[in-house]
């Protein structure tokens, strides 16, 4: 038996986070999970209903009824990792290999003169661009990024169509396409259409992961799996990468700083274990929100997230000071 408590929080975006969402406050809960062996650990639960998740209240309601969503299963798995590290008085960053992160550009208006040179000077190699608001302006932005020599990751969040994607890619300047590392979820998963899309760019699978009939495919019509430990079974995703000779990138779920540190910890562990199979991560998403007491404890050095104070995922004093509500299972 485990005992689960939760503490609600609100994150306030600095601006709209992607083409699927408005810049409205986002609700989530931190979870405190306690086991019979006396260990306890912390994790985040931050659903994105806009991208197909059950709502926060639906997931908590399921949990009260004794049912666990995939997200809650992952939260408990992460909390157990945290608990074991707290027992050993170790930090989640202590055992892995340092890993770079891409810079997330959520809006083309962020691209000010000198901005890209500043990123390069800080040590960034790669910019991830949220696509789909205004493809013409975004194409112009990609041209500017390509001129800087930085690699690009394009994320369409499966909101487009094959026809729109093909037209967009074919019309890009010749200087741009060679610097596109991959395109994430170009449109809703379709085995044959994604296979055609691969002729235009390397394709990464992210929020369409559950749409793939893994037991039925004879080949993988994509090159990279992007996993979010907050909602993806990490071991299963790694096994698929090994089976189909794919690369893997770890990203946070644009969630609470607790979730950010968990994601980086997983990325560092995988990089240490699997080497070149693991690409740069995309976990520096805490800066998309207004500063709070948790985000204030996070520091970066260019594309690296630095170790914060505490054991496990850290934040010891802040977590201790929160009000926790026990979740009663019916």
Curated annotation (Swiss-Prot):
Pathway: Quinol/quinone metabolism; 1,4-dihydroxy-2-naphthoate biosynthesis; 1,4-dihydroxy-2-naphthoate from chorismate: step 4/7; Cofactor biosynthesis; phylloquinone biosynthesis
UniProt GO BP: menaquinone biosynthetic process; phylloquinone biosynthetic process
Protein residues bound to Mg(2+): 155, 184, 206
Catalytic center residues: 130, 228
Keywords: Lyase, Magnesium, Menaquinone biosynthesis, Metal-binding
Protein name: o-succinylbenzoate synthase
Cofactor dependence: a divalent metal cation
Complex formation: Monomer.
Domain of life of the source: Bacteria
Pfam families membership: OSBS_N
Principal EC category: lyase
Catalytic reactions on record: (1R,6R)-6-hydroxy-2-succinyl-cyclohexa-2,4-diene-1-carboxylate = 2-succinylbenzoate + H2O
Its biological purpose: Converts 2-succinyl-6-hydroxy-2,4-cyclohexadiene-1-carboxylate (SHCHC) to 2-succinylbenzoate (OSB). Does not show N-succinylamino acid racemase (NSAR) activity with N-succinyl-L-phenylglycine as substrate.
Gene3D superfamilies registered for this protein in UniProt: Enolase-like C-terminal domain, Enolase-like, N-terminal domain
InterPro entries reported in the protein's UniProt record: Enolase-like_C_sf, Enolase-like_N, OSBS_N
SUPFAM superfamilies per UniProt: Enolase C-terminal domain-like
Family: Belongs to the mandelate racemase/muconate lactonizing enzyme family. MenC type 1 subfamily.
Upper classification of the organism: Bacteria, Pseudomonadati, Bdellovibrionota, Bdellovibrionia, Bdellovibrionales
């Amino acid at each position: 038996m485990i005992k689960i408590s939760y503490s609600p929080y609100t994150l306030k975006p600095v601006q709209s986070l992607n083409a699927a969402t408005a810049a409205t406050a986002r609700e989530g809960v931190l979870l405190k999970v306690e086991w019979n062996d006396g260990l306890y650990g912390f994790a985040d639960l931050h659903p994105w209903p806009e991208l197909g998740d059950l709502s926060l209240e639906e997931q908590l309601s399921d949990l009260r009824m004794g049912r666990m969503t995939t997200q809650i299963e992952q939260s408990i798995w992460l909390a157990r990792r945290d608990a074991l590290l707290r027992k050993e008085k170790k930090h989640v960053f202590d055992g892995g290999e340092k890993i770079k992160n891409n810079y997330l550009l959520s809006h083309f208006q962020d691209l000010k003169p000198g901005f890209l040179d500043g990123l390069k000077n800080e040590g960034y190699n790669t910019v991830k661009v949220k696509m789909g608001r205004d493809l013409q302006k975004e194409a112009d932005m990609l041209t500017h990024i390509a001129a800087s020599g930085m690699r690009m990751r394009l994320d369409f969040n499966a909101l487009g169509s094959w026809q729109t994607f093909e037209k967009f890619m074919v019309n890009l300047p010749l200087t741009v396409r060679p610097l596109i590392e991959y395109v994430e979820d170009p449109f809703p998963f379709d085995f044959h259409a994604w296979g055609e899309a691969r002729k235009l760019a390397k394709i990464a699978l992210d929020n369409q992961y559950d749409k793939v009939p893994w037991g039925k495919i004879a080949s993988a019509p994509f090159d990279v799996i992007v996993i979010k430990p907050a909602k993806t079974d990490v071991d299963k995703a790694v096994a698929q990468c090994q089976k189909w000779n794919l690369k893997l990138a770890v990203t946070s779920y644009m969630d609470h700083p607790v979730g950010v540190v968990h994601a980086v910890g997983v990325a560092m562990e995988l990089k240490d274990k699997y080497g070149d199979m693991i690409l740069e991560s995309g976990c520096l998403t805490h800066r998309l929100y207004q500063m709070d007491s948790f985000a204030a404890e996070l520091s970066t050095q260019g594309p690296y997230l630095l170790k914060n104070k505490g054991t496990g995922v850290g934040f010891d004093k802040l977590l201790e000071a929160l009000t926790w509500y026990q979740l009663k299972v019916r």
